[in-house]
Amino acid sequence: MQDIKTYLSTAPVLATLWFSSLAGLLIEINRFFPDALTFPFFSF
């Protein structure tokens, strides 16, 4: 039972950190490449 409580208390924290870092990354990409449909570092 203690393991379930530990899991439920850490999963939202990890999800919040992951989504916050992902949102920050997307914001920074849009800051350097505004309104880009294709990104220069993805074109081969």
UniProtKB/Swiss-Prot annotation:
Domain of life the protein comes from: Eukaryota
Membrane topology recorded in Swiss-Prot or TrEMBL: Single-pass membrane protein
Major location category of this protein: plastid
UniProtKB keywords: Chloroplast, Membrane, Photosynthesis, Photosystem I, Plastid, Thylakoid, Transmembrane, Transmembrane helix
UniProt record, GO biological process: photosynthesis
SUPFAM superfamilies xrefs: Subunit IX of photosystem I reaction centre, PsaJ
GO cellular component: chloroplast thylakoid membrane; photosystem I
Gene3D superfamilies found in the cross-reference section: Single helix bin
Membrane-crossing residue ranges in chain numbering: 7-27
Pfam family, one: PSI_PsaJ
Compartments it resides in: Plastid, Chloroplast thylakoid membrane
Family membership noted in the UniProt record: Belongs to the PsaJ family.
HAMAP family in the cross-refs: PSI_PsaJ
Function: May help in the organization of the PsaE and PsaF subunits.
Protein name according to UniProt: Photosystem I reaction center subunit IX
Native organism: Welwitschia mirabilis (Tree tumbo)
Gene that produces this protein: psaJ
